[in-house]
């Protein structure tokens, strides 16, 4: 399974490099922001192999991380082992937030990609405001399922 996950991450990295995007955020939601999503919309599970109901994956050219809560620490650790995805345990003091993680890796003017259908308008606005001090933009035109998993 891990070789499949590694291939998927490599395909995403190739796609975002082609689109001049430096990081991509993959949530656990669907276009309706449902708590339980249909298999077609389980992009975070598809890219990471992590089957828990809550988590967010961030992929950059060289780094990948999964943020999830304490219900899933053990499960996530097992499921992402060997994938190159680091586990970030939410709500622990040593765990960087996703914006802090991105700020440590991105340069001024870099673009953070999302599938705009998978985030609320408020989440997109919040991300845009949070990234603005470093000059980063949020791009919302990539559909992971249609453009990467061909």
What are these language model-derived features?
Residues 1-150:
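Terminal domain-start leader segments
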